[in-house]
Amino acid sequence: MSHRLPRGATLMIQGTTSDAGKSTLVTGLCRALHRRGFRVAPFKPQNMALNSAVTPQGGEIGRAQAVQAQACGLPPHTDMNPVLLKPYADQGSQVIIQGHAVGNMDARRYHEFKPTALSAVLESYARLAHQFQAVIVEGAGSPAEINLRTGDIANMGFAEAVDCPVLLVADIDRGGVFAHLVGTLELLSASERERIRGFVINRFRGDMDLLRPGIEWLQRRTGKPVVGVLPHLDGLYLDAEDAVVTKSRPAAPGQDTRLKVIAPRLPRISNHTDFDALRLHPQVDFRFIGTGAPPPPADLVILPGSKSVRADLAWLREAGWEGAIRRHLRYGGKLLGLCGGFQMLGQAIHDPAGLEGPPGSSPGLGLLDFETTLELEKQLRTVSGILILEGATVSGYEIHAGVSSGPALERPACRLERGAEGALSDDGQILGTYVHGLFDEPEALTALLRWAGLPQPRVFDVRLERERGIDRVAAAVEAELNMELIMDLLSGSGRREGHAPAGQP
């Protein structure tokens, strides 16, 4: 049966928990609809994450929405994630509205700000609904968080405001899937329960015949269909929204010697997707090293980006990394600093306005001769140019409040369209840059691996891995979900009728 979608047809995906599979399911649905010839866009009203992406217009959105835009064949846009919260402390976040920071807020102040945030959410959604045939919306966390229900703009508060149907997804791999689904329904209001039109069970591995009695019970108990059961997709690569993947894929038997790369898992690490290309490269053994673990020997040490650079630098020192880095350099190892990690390499970091914590200054590691001052206006841009190493092509994006200056910058790491950027030490052992996504460009990745000591790096393109991941999820969505029901929900014809789940009579 073919479907015609009205402009702005909307379906929302909510989850019983964080990491239930909302982002992945939205990505798969977006690609499936795009393949069917529909003009579709992703939307997440509110996101809390330190992994972000820069749009071509110079705005900031959650990384997951940038991947979902790719699934739709679109460039990312700030309307796809109008509210982004970037935690800089346990009880405070930088609030980004339609791509641009409006200030730091604690939970109480943000609660008071929510009506303004909701206005931005509805404004962005209205623009997407006007431009596209379909909008696939991703919720945040769980809709059943009792303490967050008042003034909710991320889950049912949004669904009720725009009057859209909802599918509820739960992760069976972590256990308790039926309790999660039934319990979530029990904690919703009557109108919210009615809005949930079906369930998706995610990450199933096993015998469907053993699961089927549970599905039948769930449908009888709730009166709602199981729209489908998605399998656990081993080895799937999609950019993580916030969870840090700590190490590389296991090496294949008989594989070449691998370059050893380590990075501290900073408490406020940001944009750790920078490391995905290293984590997935077949010749790289990459590991994040957490609290309490001494830094092991490595060929390359990378200091990641941070949302609280001075606080993370203090943590780095307390964890013994400063001495370990100096020993690493003394024995000929390479050191790379990315964004906040680059700032740590200098002589000092100044935060006179208290943008990332109490106002003040902190001494840097003193490995490069420059200083950084954090300023109110954040630098947001996509960039391209060449890496000084081998003249390799480089592209990526910048997200930082720091402005750096000093003699070390006279020997840059990159030459970008807008000018020289970053720093390379006189002895060539230390490289620092503000460019995120540095390893995503195959030429730059190859040059950096060779610089770090890998004689013959294989060409590797993480962007192709991402595209394959999107296609895998879309194929699973098409094969395992009741797409007829989903299309009915989008077109409006299925809002009040019952439907059989995928694979069910």
From Swiss-Prot:
<feature type="active site">
    <location>
        <position position="436"/>
    </location>
</feature>
<dbReference type="InterPro" id="IPR047045">
    <property type="entry name" value="CobQ_N"/>
</dbReference>
<dbReference type="InterPro" id="IPR027417">
    <property type="entry name" value="P-loop_NTPase"/>
</dbReference>
<dbReference type="InterPro" id="IPR033949">
    <property type="entry name" value="CobQ_GATase1"/>
</dbReference>
<keyword id="KW-0315">Glutamine amidotransferase</keyword>
<dbReference type="InterPro" id="IPR002586">
    <property type="entry name" value="CobQ/CobB/MinD/ParA_Nub-bd_dom"/>
</dbReference>
<protein>
    <recommendedName>
        <fullName>Cobyric acid synthase</fullName>
    </recommendedName>
</protein>
<dbReference type="Pfam" id="PF01656">
    <property type="entry name" value="CbiA"/>
</dbReference>
<dbReference type="InterPro" id="IPR011698">
    <property type="entry name" value="GATase_3"/>
</dbReference>
<keyword id="KW-0169">Cobalamin biosynthesis</keyword>
<dbReference type="GO" id="GO:0009236">
    <property type="term" value="P:cobalamin biosynthetic process"/>
</dbReference>
<feature type="active site" description="Nucleophile">
    <location>
        <position position="339"/>
    </location>
</feature>
<dbReference type="GO" id="GO:0015420">
    <property type="term" value="F:ABC-type vitamin B12 transporter activity"/>
</dbReference>
<comment type="similarity">
    <text>Belongs to the CobB/CobQ family. CobQ subfamily.</text>
</comment>
<dbReference type="InterPro" id="IPR029062">
    <property type="entry name" value="Class_I_gatase-like"/>
</dbReference>
<comment type="function">
    <text>Catalyzes amidations at positions B, D, E, and G on adenosylcobyrinic A,C-diamide. NH(2) groups are provided by glutamine, and one molecule of ATP is hydrogenolyzed for each amidation.</text>
</comment>
<feature type="domain" description="GATase cobBQ-type">
    <location>
        <begin position="258"/>
        <end position="444"/>
    </location>
</feature>
<dbReference type="Pfam" id="PF07685">
    <property type="entry name" value="GATase_3"/>
</dbReference>
<dbReference type="InterPro" id="IPR004459">
    <property type="entry name" value="CobQ_synth"/>
</dbReference>
<dbReference type="GO" id="GO:0003824">
    <property type="term" value="F:catalytic activity"/>
</dbReference>
<comment type="pathway">
    <text>Cofactor biosynthesis; adenosylcobalamin biosynthesis.</text>
</comment>
